[in-house]
């Protein structure tokens, strides 16, 4: 495996991505093109949770996927999250397509994975980047490449559905209402989705994921949805690997199944397949 940190630019604003590239397997008679996952971690739009970066990357590397971690635009005193975050996703996808000469990449099998706030970015991208009018409006047409599917883990979907808790916080994320309700951006062209959450999520109510799943169904977009009966927000792997020290509430045997469930789903939709 090769780990690479790369500075990219979107609208002249630099940002960093970390790529985990699989090495070719010498035993194979010919190079095998592998799918790519791009991870947008959570953190309430104010930081990027490291519990949702490398531990997740290692799981999907083991399934034969190259993995990139994208620390998308956060909200701060001078910046809103949108639309810059979507431009960063688009530029990252484009950069992946530019690496085919260096790595064995299948550019038709790029998966976006978002946790919590990162799920809001990914869900919005899945709608806006597949809508020709909005692609032009937000200047996403300047980038090459497209994603094939998305995975959402306890995602923020609707900024009026429990997180954030005030209108002031919502406006710090973005004042552009196009991004407030990701479910309303879903179109018939959106990509297939795997979504999971817990019914007892105390920070981002499960209504968020439900709204998105219903929107996908309305537009006949393939979706697999798992709502686990109990568990806190921010479980990540839900195992000892991502457990915060001394806090057993981050252990959840039921929810920890999501990696194998998502891998099975990726196999079903032919993102992961036999060589």
How would you name each of these model-derived features?
Residues 33-42:
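Short beta-strand element of the alpha/beta-hydrolase
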Residues 189, 195-197, 201:
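Short beta-strand/loop motif that positions the catalytic acidic residue
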Residues 50-68:
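Short amphipathic alpha-helix adjacent to the substrate-entry channel of hydrolases
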Residues 217-275:
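C-terminal catalytic histidine-bearing segment of alpha/beta-hydrolase fold enzymes
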Residues 1-32, 165, 254:
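N-terminal cap/lid segment of alpha/beta-hydrolase-fold proteins
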């Amino acid at each position: 495996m090769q780990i690479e940190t790369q500075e990219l630019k979107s609208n002249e604003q630099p940002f960093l991505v970390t790529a985990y590239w699989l090495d070719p397997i010498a035993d194979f008679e010919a190079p095998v093109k592998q799918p790519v996952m791009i991870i947008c971690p959570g953190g309430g739009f104010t930081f990027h949770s490291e519990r949702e970066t490398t531990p997740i990357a290692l799981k999907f590397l083991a399934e034969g996927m190259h993995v990139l971690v994208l620390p998308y635009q956060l909200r701060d005193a001078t910046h809103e999250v949108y639309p810059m975050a979507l431009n960063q996703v688009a530029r990252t996808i484009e950069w992946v397509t530019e690496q085919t000469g260096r790595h064995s990449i299948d550019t038709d099998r790029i998966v976006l994975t978002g946790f919590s706030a990162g799920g809001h970015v990914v869900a919005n991208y899945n709608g806006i980047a597949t809508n020709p009018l909005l692609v032009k409006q937000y200047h996403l047409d300047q980038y090459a490449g497209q994603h094939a599917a998305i995975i959402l883990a306890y995602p923020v979907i609707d900024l009026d559905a429990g997180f954030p808790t005030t209108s002031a916080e919502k406006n710090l994320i973005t004042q552009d209402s196009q991004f407030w309700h990701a479910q309303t951006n879903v179109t018939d062209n959106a990509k297939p989705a795997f979504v999971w959450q817990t019914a007892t999520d105390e920070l981002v109510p499960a209504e968020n994921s439900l709204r998105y799943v219903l929107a996908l169904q309305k537009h006949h977009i393939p979706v697999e949805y798992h709502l686990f009966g109990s568990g806190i927000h921010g479980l990540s792997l839900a195992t000892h690997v991502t457990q915060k020290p001394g806090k057993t509430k981050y252990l959840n045997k039921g929810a920890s199944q999501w990696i194998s469930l998502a891998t099975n789903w990726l196999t079903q939709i032919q993102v992961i397949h036999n060589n």
